[in-house]
Amino acid sequence: MESQDYIPALPPSSVDAERSVLGAVLQDSGAATLAFETLSPEDFYTAEHREIFSAMQTLHIAGNPIDLMTVGNELSRRGTLDSVGGPAYLLEAVRFVPTTEIGRAHV
């Protein structure tokens, strides 16, 4: 019997959609509320996005604001800021979303 080549299915994901969600959460408390009600860190395909969302979720649960500074500080406290792309990547996520409605659409 001949063996067939097996190609595993890739999980559905869009790095751009994930970045849109992160950018929207950083800019809009309404988008943040929707994201935290709907998503968990495990819903993100990239490890970097999982870690960023997890840091955001930690801040949210503690009742802290979510913005570039607080998320950057939380990631720094965890020792993961550099591994997720640093402050520059967080800023890129914000700039990637021209309106938070786009990020909300991807939740």
Regions found by a protein language model. Name each.
Residues 1-104:
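Noncatalytic partner-interaction/assembly domains of nucleic-acid and motor enzyme complexes
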